């Protein structure tokens, strides 16, 4: 499956998990380390959604590239690195503050 297809499948899984305002961005022309970024607002704790995304990604042969120990600050924003796909799980407050949607507004593939 292509990176585009995998990013779309991850976005669909996030929607099924009741994540809000899920967006897929094609960032390949703007960043050298990933092709797609999926950004989602997650109500509640992020770790359950993190696990679900990893399970869905594994179905497409994707594994987290740079997995690190998680800290308390990551209950506001977690970045999951699957190589060509970055998944940003954010609280509503973190999403409003960092405003990745504005940063990548010209790269939007799907909302």
Swiss-Prot record:
A GO term, aspect molecular function: ribosomal large subunit binding
| UniProt cross-references to Gene3D superfamilies, sorted A to Z | Beta Polymerase, domain 2 (3.30.460.10)
> What S-S linkages are listed for this chain?
none
Main localization, broad class: cytoplasm
Task: Give the UniProt subcellular location, in the record's own words.
Answer: Cytoplasm
**Keywords recorded for this protein, A-Z:** Cytoplasm, Repressor, Translation regulation
Biological process, per Gene Ontology: cytosolic ribosome assembly; negative regulation of ribosome biogenesis; negative regulation of translation
Does the entry feature the keyword Cell wall biogenesis/degradation, yes or no? no
Residues of the signal peptide: none
Question: What Pfam families would the database entry show?
Answer: RsfS
Biological function: Functions as a ribosomal silencing factor. Interacts with ribosomal protein uL14 (rplN), blocking formation of intersubunit bridge B8. Prevents association of the 30S and 50S ribosomal subunits and the formation of functional ribosomes, thus repressing translation.
Q: Which family does it belong to?
A: Belongs to the Iojap/RsfS family.
| Complex and partners | Interacts with ribosomal protein uL14 (rplN).
Q: What is this protein called?
A: Ribosomal silencing factor RsfS
Gene for this chain:
rsfS
């Amino acid at each position: 499956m292509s990176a585009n297809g995998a990013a779309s499948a991850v976005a669909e899984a996030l929607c099924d998990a009741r994540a809000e305002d899920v967006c897929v961005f094609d960032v390949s022309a703007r960043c050298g380390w990933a092709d797609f970024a999926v950004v989602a607002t997650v109500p509640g704790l992020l770790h359950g959604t993190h696990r679900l995304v990893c399970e869905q990604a594994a179905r497409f042969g994707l594994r987290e590239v740079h997995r690190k120990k998680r800290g308390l600050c990551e209950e506001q924003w977690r970045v999951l690195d699957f190589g060509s796909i970055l998944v940003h799980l954010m609280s509503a407050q973190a999403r409003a503050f960092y405003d990745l949607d504005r940063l990548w507004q010209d790269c939007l593939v799907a909302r």
